[in-house]
Swiss-Prot record:
Gene3D superfamilies: ATP synthase, F0 complex, subunit A (1.20.120.220). CDD domains: ATP-synt_Fo_a_6. It is a multi-pass membrane protein. The chain crosses the membrane at residues 33-53, 95-115, 134-154, 199-219, 220-240. Belongs to the ATPase A chain family. This is ATP synthase subunit a, plastid. HAMAP family: ATP_synth_a_bact. F-type ATPases have 2 components, CF(1) - the catalytic core - and CF(0) - the membrane proton channel. CF(1) has five subunits: alpha(3), beta(3), gamma(1), delta(1), epsilon(1). CF(0) has four main subunits: a, b, b' and c. It comes from the Eukaryota. One of its GO terms (cellular component) is plastid membrane. Pfam families: ATP-synt_A. One of its GO terms (molecular function) is proton transmembrane transporter activity. The keyword Ribosomal protein does not apply. It comes from Cuscuta reflexa (Southern Asian dodder).
Amino acid sequence: MDVLSCSIKTLKGLYDLSGVEVGQHFYWQIGDFLVHGQVLITSWVVIAILLGSATVAVRNPQTIPTVGQNLFEYVLEFIRDVSKTQIGEEYGPWVPFIGTLFLFIFVSNWSGALLPWKILQLPHGELAAPTNDINTTVALALLTSAAYFYAGISKKGLGYFSKYIKPTPILLPINILEDFTKPLSLSFRLFGNILADELVVVVLVSLVPSVVPIPVMFLGLFTSGIQALIFSTLAAAYIGESMEGHL
């Protein structure tokens, strides 16, 4: 019993030391609805960063581009290449959507590692990257689903739904299930990676000297960028598939 009691106390001490909170939310009461205040706060901060950066970089275009202008032109070219590769020749109208997804997710992911969210104290929970909340990633995934349904229907009309019985009607349940698994995989992949990255960094910072977690933080930044690329690339691929003659 003494060994068990000692083990329990040790585990409790480690938990208290880490100070990690998962599932704690700060809500705003708006009418009859509860709104995740922390997600709205961090999302608007990310949006403000994106709008501010874009305004500063392109408000006075130069014949010889500045560093900021060069950076934004490179990002735009990169997003266009991703869209064209995945969607095909009709990629043009979808560049803003794919670009918005990529930039919002990229900056959101990096904000979790670079911005000192914990300085702002909330009555419940704590501020973190918007993509650290499952509601944000599900919303992004549902937007992607709506986009590829719209792309398919606008290209093929109601004939788009004939894909569910191709190549044989026996596959109808599987083809329907696929449309549910796409947003689920998108949302949970992004949410799980960002949440795990932030938890690892928080625990390491709490348990070991501050210089030790730095390599993990750099790895987290790299992973965050990759996750933004994966999400936007898959979104473009799904849109491209919905516009093809076969799926």
